[in-house]
Amino acid sequence: MTNIRKTHPLLKIVNSSFVDLPAPSSLSSWWNFGSLLGVCLAVQILTGLFLAMHYTSDTATAFNSVTHICRDVNYGWVLRYLHANGASMFFICLYLHVGRGLYYGSYTYSETWNIGILLLFAVMATAFMGYVLPWGQMSFWGATVITNLLSAIPYIGTDLVQWIWGGFSVDKATLTRFFAFHFLFPFIVAALVMVHLLFLHETGSNNPTGIPSDSDMIPFHPYYTIKDILGFLIMLTALSALVLFSPDLLGDPDNYMPANPLNTPPHIKPEWYFLFAYAILRSIPNKLGGVLALVLSILILAIVPMLHTSKQRSMMFRPLSQCLFWFLVAILFTLTWIGGQPVEYPYIIIGQMASVLYFLTILVFMPLVSIMENYLLKW
């Protein structure tokens, strides 16, 4: 008799995706981050659902409702800090996942890669709207500054900002709609994840060598399920340690002050995972130029497949490209640090230099070095 997992209409889909899926035998731990992102999304949806049961999206009560969750709701503080630090874990896994794709040339699967970029934008939008909900000082001013950037769009900018705000400033209408969208977006993200996996399973996974692995495949279960479970345990242990020992490590102390439109914080900054893009935005003195640079800092990923000039797919056997890749990582760390510093000398000039190097490395240095490596292959 045929196994039910191979005949049942629903189980058949699960089976072909997670059990009998042929996977390359050489996948390293860098391939764990996709499944870790799935766990992060599940944790965020679950904790978010329970938080939404106690949260009120009204400017008069939002801040107090978060305080109420932490003080009066059973294990409310665990829910709140799991959700806040879960977002940080989400972005750590996201950036490592994208970095792995860049390093091993996974971007040559253009459909999967482009859906991934859409996912990145959707998760960033979700996180931004979520940061506004506690209605602390940094929530309010972060929302004001970031939404106000849209006013740089010629002709329709000002109308667009007022349309998003639902008035002439960030107020009750803004908070209510941000809560509605913050609740909705994770489910859109979950749907996009399905499409992401659909396209991935059309082509099969890449592997560290970048060489087709059709001749050397193993079943996903039990080999990679066990490996993924180990990843889950490590990540959930790290998240638990962060939540239980230093829950405010990655947060901003200003957000423990209720939102006050009459008092601007000394330094408005977003959460740490947006600081690199924020530094690029601030490094350009022109408002429209800054907004374009901000969007392009992420959108540049979409043209990476077109800039692939190497004869080899992966960077595994390309030492010069490896050096440039780690140089790019160092630039991103520098930008993240600069984004958290005040706008003054020498931080301004360091941010500008790092921003220029970020775009130059991706657009010019990497394609040129790849061409050079092609010539070295002929020696």
From Swiss-Prot:
Main localization category: mitochondrion
PANTHER family (UniProt xref): CYTOCHROME B
Positions with a binding annotation for heme b b562: H83, H182
Residues noted as binding a ubiquinone in the record, renumbered to the chain: H201
Protein name: Cytochrome b
Effect recorded for S110L: In strain: Isolate TK 4728
Note: Heme 1 (or BL or b562) is low-potential and absorbs at about 562 nm, and heme 2 (or BH or b566) is high-potential and absorbs at about 566 nm.
Transmembrane parts of this sequence: 33-53, 77-98, 113-133, 178-198, 226-246, 288-308, 320-340, 347-367
Impact noted for substituting V39M: In strain: Isolate FMNH 128718
Family assignment from sequence similarity: Belongs to the cytochrome b family.
Membrane topology, record value: Multi-pass membrane protein
Outcome following mutation: Y375H: In strain: Isolate FMNH 128676, Isolate FMNH 128713, Isolate FMNH 128718, Isolate TK 4728, Isolate TK 9251, Isolate TK 11040, Isolate TK 13173, Isolate TK 13594, Isolate TK 14159, Isolate TK 34707, Isolate TK 41573, Isolate TK 43138, Isolate TK 43178, Isolate TK 43189, Isolate TK 43208, Isolate USNM578997, Isolate USNM579009 and Isolate USNM579010
